[in-house]
Amino acid sequence: VTTTSRQTMAAAAATVVISALAVVPAAPATAGNPKSCGPDASLLGFSDALDKTTFQGTQVAGLSALAPARGSRALALVDNIGTTPARIYDVDLARKAVRGVTFLTRADGTAYTGTDFDGEGLVVERSGRTVLASSEREPSIRRFGLADGREIASLPVPARFQVTPAGQAAVNQTFEALATTPDRRVLYAGMEGPLAGDGGGHRIIRYEKDKPISQYAYRTDPALGLVELVALGDDQLLALERGFTAGVGNTVRIYRVSATGAPDVTGVESLTTLTDPRAWLGKELLVDLVNCPPSGATAKQPQPNPLLDNVEGMALGERLPGGRRVLHLISDDNGSATQITRLYKLAVTIRPTATLRGRAILSATAYQPGPVSGTQLDPATVNGITPPFPGQPIPGFSAVIPADAGDRSGRHLLAMPDNGFGAKNNSADFLLRAYRIDPDYRTHKVDVRGFISFRDPDRKVPFPIVNANTKDRLLTGADFDIESLARDYRGDLWLGEEFGPYLVRTDRTGKVLQAPVPLPDGGKSPQSPDLAPGETATVPASRGFEAMAVSRDGKTLYPILEGARTDDPDQRRRIVYEFDVRANRYTGRTWTFRVDDPSLVVGDAAVLDGRQLLLIERDNAMGPQSAVKRLVVTDLDEAGAAGVLPRRTAVDLMRIADPSGVSTPARPNEYGVGPLFSFPLQSVESVLPLSGDKVLVANDNNFPGNDGRIPGRADDTELIVVDVPGLR
């Protein structure tokens, strides 16, 4: 039975565009933009106007789902509030008022109530005259007519999803989330909690034509439940995770989720058996509501931010200038005096998924002219390779720059390996070079066209080197561990290295022009030639200048320590230095880039535009153990207190879409290729922005020790081109 005209409720759901919501505005923006909730989200306002109100004798409470309808209207589903009737409210978001109510009944007209229907998920179907509503009690997904609220049909639910003892689901932990794609062809039903035996994993069922066709594995953050989904299309979703801790309050986080290339886990008895991270849906944080400005909100119980409450509903709204979208949230007060029915309005940036555009591979055994190398290595065979080696291997690339200044095509490159075999005591026969290479993304091959040798014929290096008594004084991996490379405004090259750490300047042919420049703050690594007897190293081994960016005009360098200094109490800090090329000195200015976890390192950096930097953040794992390989955007001009830089994840290199099959056909046992492409190589150490939103990424293969792509086979050097929408 409905208390509004049939036309009112049906018309309200005829389309799914929500217009602007007139809510309490967030505090005015000032320096630092206090409305910001993060790099891709800001709070536009909130409203408590619906809290503890009634409509036509019903309590407006327990609103657990929000489905967009026509104009400024949305439909809100009530959960199990006592013995009251199950119902859907027609909410005018602009006026912050309920305009109508539809009571949900069985096909025979008998009412559903809070005792037998726990409404949690709601979507409006294509016609606008029917809705699908999920109930946690059984669980179920039922179709109702909006005109009279009568049940029309129900969708099948796999038996194991039934609440125990009939199935493996826990009470009140079932279909909390329900979403449909913009074309209404796909429906997603998400489990708030795990099935018995799934550990902490959640399942999302994919329906097509009213039938379940597959299941996805999803991980929430610890102690959080999956309470809502928004389907964006193209296998992309938004996921709302929510939790509550007594005496502390709520946690509310929204993630961008990708199902690209995700496998069907219907036949997996327990999600705890999934060892490959690619078997789980990928997710990136869009907004943590605790980071939004309180904006005058009040809470009726302890909260880490008074803006927070039991948010359970989410709906995507209209487009805003600048490409952002409105995102509406609603909290469920559970009919409690200590909770609030609150509407939120956010502006969010939802970027399209990153796509693989090109891939070129240089064989691990593409030995180059030069003396036999690897003579100091253990002669045992590693990944099918036995030292010594017939010439000079290319052990991947730790830095890649254009072969010609200003070229952004990615077709002609100057690519630099590091010190060879990883240590001073095993790399004396590895010559330091930068190779001129032409990757061919059509044939997936790399043409090595020549190289420049780094050398010190003018004796600028003040400490002993391996080839000290030769004419050319070719530099080796026992002299420097070169990791980053930049070209200045004169065409000279600057090498960032890790033994010092030093900055080393050469001319365009590789000849050293001046003594290496040490850190301005006295920092030294254990391998530093400058380390005095008894002096304590403050830069860990192999944690020097792995990354270095250069300004567009070539006059400023930004070398970055790969890891934290040993004397730094903040082990997540990675120091960004500033070096004035014209003055030939450090400026004394530094910034702090904070990695997500102390174990993570900075692999490389490059300038995007102005003083905006693109960095590699990575773990030290490879293959299926790889968890963090990502590109992060920051801006030196947007540094906060104490020079701490903002950060935004631009792309997860473990989750790149490959719709065109660039990475296929797969080689035998090759990991990480196909519709979902991954870059699971241990040392992702080169990043180069190209034209538009394209980025080139390459790896150091730690020859011959890495086998992240094909187990038991030494990793090749891979150069990939990725299209990253919204990069800049």
Task: Give residue spans per PLM region.
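Sequence/structural signature of beta-propeller domains
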Residues: G32-R728
